[in-house]
């Protein structure tokens, strides 16, 4: 099962007690996956979804909020589409539901963004809007250089409204026009994790974070295969040299190493080719790269001073040509 499927399965089980929050989620699902059309002089609202669980959740919420009948139909796979789709159809009281979910104004004009009640609602409403938008048309790629959480939007107005909801819950999201479609995406790994939690997909967030950390722990070694990148090779040499110096520093100082400096030193030794930023992410609790660099610098300075007092080789003595030739 893909990460996207995992998230949707988890989000479809999120318990929502408040009707206003349920309404915000319904409004977003209908905006991002729905369309309105007149059939036989009556308004019909349809939402085209890729998950039966999401369809059943939408049916339950609408029936509970608006006391209206909702049907869920399975659309079988085709030659060009290998998986089934699920069509949620609202005929009963569709005009009233369209108004109350903010798909149209009271006078019947189509609202292109999100409902004003959602945009100006509570933090929980903003989280529900993102949950609904993701359930409707969201995706999450595997961790990597181009990893992103993305929602395909029906138009620029709805994309901007979703960015606004993200801002209200402390998430930086951006709009982009790709292949003629408006999209909202979140690319920063920390922001993706925070948004997953905000929406209610904490279990999937943990899975995604584990994949990300595992990939990042392998990345330095993989990067070294490309020796055409001179800057990267220099960085790797510097990291290995620093690791060797730290190892020497620990021997010089023995049990006199302060605990917080020892922790930074152990990270440098255990992950010899990782960047300072990567070491910071591996720390518990996490640190900035400047904090890691500062601790390692103080450790080396302390060890070199001790070596000078004892008249023994300092930490630089272990950085040899043979060591660097291995990189």
From Swiss-Prot:
Signal peptide per UniProt: none
- Residue ranges of DNA binding: 275-308
Q: Which GO terms describe its molecular function?
A: DNA binding
Which superkingdom? Answer: Bacteria
BP term (GO), one: regulation of sporulation
Which key words are in the record? Cell cycle, Cell division, DNA-binding
Q: Which family does it belong to?
A: Belongs to the WhiA family.
Reported function: Involved in cell division and chromosome segregation.
Name the UniProt record assigns to this protein = Probable cell division protein WhiA
**Per the UniProt entry, what species is this protein from, by scientific name?**
Corynebacterium glutamicum (strain R)
């Amino acid at each position: 099962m893909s990460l996207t499927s995992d998230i949707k399965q988890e989000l479809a089980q999120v318990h929502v007690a408040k009707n206003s929050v349920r309404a915000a989620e319904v409004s977003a699902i209908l905006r991002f996956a729905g369309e309105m059309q007149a059939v036989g002089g009556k308004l019909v609202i349809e939402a085209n979804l890729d998950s039966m669980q999401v369809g059943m959740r939408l049916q339950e919420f609408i029936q509970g909020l608006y006391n209206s009948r909702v049907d869920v139909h399975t659309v079988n796979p085709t030659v060009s589409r290998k998986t089934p789709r699920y069509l949620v159809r609202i005929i009963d009281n569709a005009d009233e539901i369209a108004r109350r979910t903010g798909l149209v104004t009271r006078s019947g004009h189509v609202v292109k963004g999100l409902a004003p009640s959602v945009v100006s609602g509570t933090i929980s409403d903003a989280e529900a809007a993102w949950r609904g938008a993701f359930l409707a048309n969201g995706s999450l790629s595997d961790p990597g250089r181009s990893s992103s959480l993305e929602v395909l939007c029906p138009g620029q107005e709805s994309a901007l409204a979703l960015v606004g909801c993200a801002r209200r819950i402390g998430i930086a999201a951006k709009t982009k026009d790709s292949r003629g479609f408006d999209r909202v995406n979140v690319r920063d790994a920390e922001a993706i994790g925070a948004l997953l939690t905000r929406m209610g997909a904490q279990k999937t967030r943990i899975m995604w974070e584990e994949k990300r950390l595992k990939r990042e722990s392998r990345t330095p070694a993989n990067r070294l295969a490309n020796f055409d990148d001179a800057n990267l090779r220099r960085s790797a040499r510097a990291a290995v040299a620093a690791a060797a110096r730290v190892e020497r520093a620990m021997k010089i100082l023995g049990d006199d190493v302060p605990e917080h400096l020892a922790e930074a030193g152990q990270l440098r030794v255990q992950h010899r080719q990782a960047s300072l930023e990567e070491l910071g992410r591996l720390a518990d609790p996490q640190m900035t790269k400047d904090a890691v660099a500062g601790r390692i610098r103080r450790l080396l300075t302390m060890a070199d001073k001790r070596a000078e007092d004892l008249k023994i080789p300092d930490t630089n003595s272990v950085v040899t040509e043979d060591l660097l030739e291995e990189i």
